[in-house]
Amino acid sequence: MADKNTRTFTSRDAARCIIVPSDLDHKYSRGVLGLITGSAQYPGAAVLSTSACLATGVGMARFHSSSGLAHLVLHDAPEAVVQPGPVTAWLAGSGIHHKKYSDFTTYLRHRWFVLMKRQTVPTVLDAGALYLAGKLSQPTLITPHAGELARLLASHSISVSSESIEADPVTWAQKTAQLLGVTVLLKGSRTVVAQGDRVIALPKATPYLATAGTGDVLAGIIGALVATNYIEILNSPQRLAEVAAAGAYIHNQAALLASLGRSEERR
């Protein structure tokens, strides 16, 4: 349930997380997001997360993968860079199975996580990378839905159903944030962000977001914002919660605009 530490996120809050480039900026100073997303089972996640990242105003997207996934990403976004190099933030796990040894290709995707673990830049963990929550030294944001959060908590000997989490997202997001020392963005019809004892509540999401792939798009948007805000986040880790909420807010607003367009087309 909501308490005195919970506040509602607004468009003005989101605007404060948008870094506007200056005449002195270049592609590196505008933020570089390293992506380890997509797999043989879910190749679309690689394309969706990278494209969303680039559409959100990052200076560069570095996609890390085998040649097959890289070709798919480059076909949709030729400006993406598919060589390892310096990054200002990481996004990992979208479209990757959480069971590392489920098959050989998934194992290979998990091996890329070593790159991320060796650095100290802000990191976003989604889907198959959630098990790393609490194991990294850098500022970390996790973006689970209720089912993924239930599985993560079970790995820490806390038994709770996804239905219970959905019924009280604020409590469970807070508990997870405090347990693991990370920022938690718990996805749902009412998305919440928890950091320590602070909670940010997002406006109710449009049901048009209840489709496959929207989580990958959200991850890309948030990853881009984290990459562009990396200096602010390293100076003040509390900024990570604001940036995460801004990503969810932008994601929902984009979906609302897109759904209005579809409604007009059907008339």
PLM features per residue range, with description:
Residues 1-124, 131-141, 146, 151-267:
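Small-residue (G/A/S/T)-rich helix-start motifs and N-terminal tracts that mark the onset
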